[in-house]
Amino acid sequence: ELSRYQLKTAVLEKELDVACGNSSRNTGMLHAGFTYKPGSLKAECAVEGNQEFDQVAKELGVPFKRTGKLVVGFTDHDRENILKYKAIGEQNGVKGMRMIDKDEINRIDPNAGGEFAMYVPSSGILDPMQYTIGLAENACQNGVRFHFGQKVTGITRDEAKDVWVVKTEQDTFETKWVINCAGMYASEISEMLGYPNYPVKGF
């Protein structure tokens, strides 16, 4: 996204190419946004990003298919939980969600099982590796410079120059802004910037 603006942008990557880490190792599922807290930034980004993704995939030349998603259930307890997700999705603006019975489940996906399900038509799938590469190629075409094999070892502040000094195993870079997108190593970069590291638990 930053490559669309008149900025001088560089990416420091410790690997020798893009798509060598977490970015290309996820499920490849485009989420609809029915699991995120209503009103949260994550919910807003998920729903808006979902709605825009057909155009994004087209611009990047990345294969993408809106397969829809089935959240299946068997018991009354399952139904109660699924209806909670449906309510969350409706608050977040997810369109087209509906409860379906076993016959309709079998028409959509005979292997899914379940006595009932929530059908979410806006979910989809893509190849996360191709998507990551597509984003990088697009950014490169727009003028972003990629520096590979550049593991960041330290970040300090130079107040006199009003810049951050980023040191890698090979070079030193000076920048007005640092964007931490280090995946599973993001906490290490945050600590270099002076932010405390604290553990969090997923759901």
Go through each PLM region and give its residues:
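Glycine-rich FAD pyrophosphate-binding loop
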Residues: 3-25
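Hydrophobic anchor at the start of a short beta-strand
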Residues: 7-9, 96-97, 178
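Short loop/edge segments at beta-strand edges and connector loops
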Residues: 13, 66, 100-102, 148-150, ...
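A short, glycine/Asx- and small/polar-enriched loop/turn
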Residues: 25, 77-80, 108-115, 156-165, ...
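Dinucleotide-binding Rossmann-like beta1-alpha1 core, especially the glycine-rich loop
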Residues: 28-104, 108, 114
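Phosphate- and divalent-cation-binding pockets in alpha/beta enzyme and binding domains
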Residues: 81, 188-189
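Helical element adjacent to the flavin cofactor pocket in flavoenzyme catalytic cores
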Residues: 118-177, 181, 185-188
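Glycine-rich beta-alpha-beta "Rossmann" dinucleotide-binding loop(s) and their flanking helix/strand
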Residues: 189-203
